[in-house]
Amino acid sequence: MATALSPPRGPKLKGAPPSHYYESFLEKKGPCDQDYRKFWAGLQGLAICFYNSNRDLQPLEKLDLRLFSKLRDEALLGSSRDTAYHFSLVLRDQEVKFKVESLESCEMWKGFILTVVELRVPSNLTLLPGHLYMMAEVLTKEEVRRAAEVPWCFLQVSRLEAQLLLERYPECGNLLLRPGGDGKDSVSVTTRQILNGSPVVKHYKVKRAGSKYVIDVEDPFSCPSLEAVVNYFVTHTKRALVPFLLDEDYEKVLGFVDSDRENGESAWAVPSFRASGPALPANVLKPLPPVPVSVSSQEDKLPQLPPLPQLPDTDENYVTPIEDSPAAEYMNQDVSLSSQAVPLKPKKPARLPAKPPKPSVVPKPDLKAITSVWTRKLGGSSSQASSLVTRLGDITAELEEKLQKRRALEH
């Protein structure tokens, strides 16, 4: 059985090339680059896209013109062989330098950038009528594009939240759009500026009139879109007001590039679970939580502390004199014991006299009385009594002799 032939497959359609307001080769040097790098660049809305070649569909990097501050011409500081033209794009967070081969390309890039940023065709550049006509067409396209989208500085916040955002992130801008307080299609504008060191917060009402927005000021001004409302506040304040753009360079959700096994195409995927930490193996037991112990049980288990040793008596460090009588009598010795005792200074030890004290005078013994006493005790032994009397006389004579010698030494 014959099978129906399938139609031949046609060539795979490639993606449509991106549409740019203006595109050409452009050499770029960022704040982290040491030298210029050549790209194929294109202006797309409020962004400058950089490609490796004019055949690439995805840009390598972009510059956000919503952070535009000013354009500045660069002086030629290189060698005489460098005939390129230089200009710088100053943004709120960085400054990027560019280099092009001709003056026409330099003026074209500056003209288109100012057209999409300021929503007007610049008149201070060296441009031909054809160039001005091209920029007028770009201006119309950009106004239509912005009318269909909400400005980046429009946030769904309340009046108080808008004030807090402008106060907390002053580096992100000082002008913010929010829904009106009447619950209708109206819009409110909140601004915050510093005057003599003090913040000044203002709120403006924008009414909806059909397809237009009317700024409710002394001289009401009608705008075709919310983007035009933002541009009105920026241009009429000499760019003192800057649209609020919260820095969201960091992602909040983890993602990765995943390839489809069926068709082989790559797509951005987000994990379906959030791991709080490394999972434990199945055979590893989880540690048990600590058991709370009451204070009373802990006190019962604690060993008793040994008693503290007694402190030494401070009086032991002092020498107490024995029978140290006062040297003189004072009038205030009758003070009661309840009064505060005054510590006395230790007395100096008394000096010994240079000469020994005089010995007390001993009376002379009565020889007759002594002789009579011993005579009675010895009974009738006259010979013993006479010998004893003789010895006593000798002792008495010896004592008298020693006494006379001592008196002689004293005198």
UniProtKB/Swiss-Prot annotation:
Mind telling me which PROSITE patterns this protein's record contains? Answer: SH2
Q: Print the keywords alphabetically.
A: Coiled coil, Cytoplasm, Membrane, Phosphoprotein, SH2 domain
Q: Name any GO cellular component annotation.
A: plasma membrane
Describe PTMs of this protein.
Answer: Phosphorylated on tyrosine. Phosphorylated by PTK6 at Tyr-250 modulates PTK6-mediated STAT3 activation.
Q: Give the coiled coil ranges.
A: 390-410
Residue numbers of Phosphotyrosine PTMs: 22, 250, 318, 330
> Where do the record's region annotations for Disordered lie?
291-320, 338-364
Where's it mainly located?
cytoplasm
Q: Identify the SUPFAM superfamilies for this entry.
A: PH domain-like, SH2 domain
**Where is the protein situated, by its record's location annotation?**
Cytoplasm; Membrane
- Which SMART domains does this UniProt record tie to the protein? PH, SH2
> Where is the PH domain positioned along the sequence?
20-120
In its UniProt record, a GO molecular function of this protein is: signaling adaptor activity
In which tissues or organs does this protein occur?
A: Widely expressed.
Keyword Cell inner membrane applies: no
Which residue range or ranges hold the SH2 domain? 152-248
Membrane topology term:
Peripheral membrane protein
**Quaternary structure and partners:** Interacts with PTK6 and CSF1R.
What's this protein's function?
Answer: Substrate of protein kinase PTK6. May play a regulatory role in the acute-phase response in systemic inflammation and may modulate STAT3 activity.
What is the protein name stated in its UniProt record? Signal-transducing adaptor protein 2
Which species?
Answer: Mus musculus (Mouse)
Upper lineage is:
Eukaryota, Metazoa, Chordata, Craniata, Vertebrata
- What gene makes this protein? Stap2
